[in-house]
């Protein structure tokens, strides 16, 4: 008999602010949450899930990133500031300020570099908070950042394509050009393929190894979410209320039929693949949180826990814990398992 995926509620609490972003500690025992009114909150899952406000950004907090295998995490906000925090004592310091909102943060896989997206500029800091380089000239505001696995290359999605920068001395940059506004940047786990969802309702792929590029059309709305399965076999994409999964086996997506995952009755607001394990989670304005296993014949598991629009989803590094937040500021932490 095939195992059946399960979602079990572990902790539920009221944050008191609209949840904008979140990040788990490497061991999954702590989660930090950015609030729309500026709060930075820490939730210990070993202490009954109490939310502790440890600091703030004026105007609103916008992004969080936790150092892989480390104790540091970064936050940014509408005040243009980037704060570097030590989770062992909640001390923080400002390592960067900008006159515009700072919306994008991402640590490299080895935790030694932090990428910061400010409008059209990309700043790179080391883990001590010292700025290493500034890369300007992106066409339009940076919409997403993603580090190539096991490398010092970071992709920045913007208008007209995705720019990939190898952080070295000097910085080596390459433009993967495509007309239109790129909204996402997602690396296949082996680093061989870069995918981006576009405003015009297409998905574009660049094979970094062969140089080949391809495009998938047919979406009825902008492709706002993309993500790879942990084994690199599937790329999930979401537009409007539907999810389309492309299989990257054999000849790649051109030689396979797309898998359509239909379960939402309103626009999908969040979609995320588990870093480990076969799971894909999606949530939407229909107040539904669905757990899928692309490539399996299961129907999705409906968490059936929410009465408001879900605006935040985040997996722990081991893929065993899932955090969801709704627009009223309620947080739910769930354990992902099988029966």
Per-range role (PLM):
Residues 1-339:
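WD40-repeat beta-propeller superdomains and closely related acidic/aromatic-rich repeat-like regions
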């Amino acid at each position: 008999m095939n195992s059946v995926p399960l979602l079990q509620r572990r902790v539920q609490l009221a944050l008191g602010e609209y949840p904008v972003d979140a990040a788990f500690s490497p061991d999954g025992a702590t989660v930090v949450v950015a609030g729309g009114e500026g709060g930075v909150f820490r939730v210990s899952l070993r202490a009954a899930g109490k939310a502790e406000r440890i600091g703030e950004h004026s105007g609103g907090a916008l992004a969080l990133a936790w150092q892989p295998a480390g104790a540091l995490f970064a936050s940014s906000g509408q005040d243009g500031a980037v704060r570097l925090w030590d989770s062992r004592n909640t001390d923080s310091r400002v390592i960067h300020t900008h006159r515009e909102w700072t919306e994008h943060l991402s640590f490299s896989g080895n935790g030694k570099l932090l990428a910061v997206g400010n409008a059209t500029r990309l700043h790179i800091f080391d883990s001590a908070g010292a700025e290493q380089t500034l890369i300007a000239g992106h066409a339009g505001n940076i919409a997403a950042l993603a580090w190539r696995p096991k490398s010092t290359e970071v992709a920045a999605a913007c208008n007209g394509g995705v720019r990939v920068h190898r952080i070295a001395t000097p910085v080596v940059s390459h433009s993967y050009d495509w007309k239109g506004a790129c909204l996402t940047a997602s690396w296949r786990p082996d680093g061989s393929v870069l995918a981006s969802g576009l405003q015009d309702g297409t998905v574009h792929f660049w094979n970094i190894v062969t140089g080949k590029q391809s495009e998938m059309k047919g979406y009825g709305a902008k492709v706002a979410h993309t993500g790879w399965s942990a084994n690199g076999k599937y790329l999930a994409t979401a537009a409007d209320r539907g999810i389309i999964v492309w299989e990257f086996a054999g000849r790649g997506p051109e030689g396979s039929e797309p898998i359509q995952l239909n379960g939402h009755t309103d626009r999908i607001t969040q979609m995320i693949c588990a870093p480990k394990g076969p799971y894909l989670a999606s949530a939407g304005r229909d107040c539904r949180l669905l757990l899928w296993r692309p490539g399996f014949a299961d129907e999705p598991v409906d968490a059936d826990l929410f009465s408001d629009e879900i605006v935040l989803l985040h997996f722990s590094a081991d893929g065993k814990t899932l955090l969801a937040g709704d627009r009223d500021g309620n947080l739910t932490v769930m354990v992902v398992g099988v029966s």
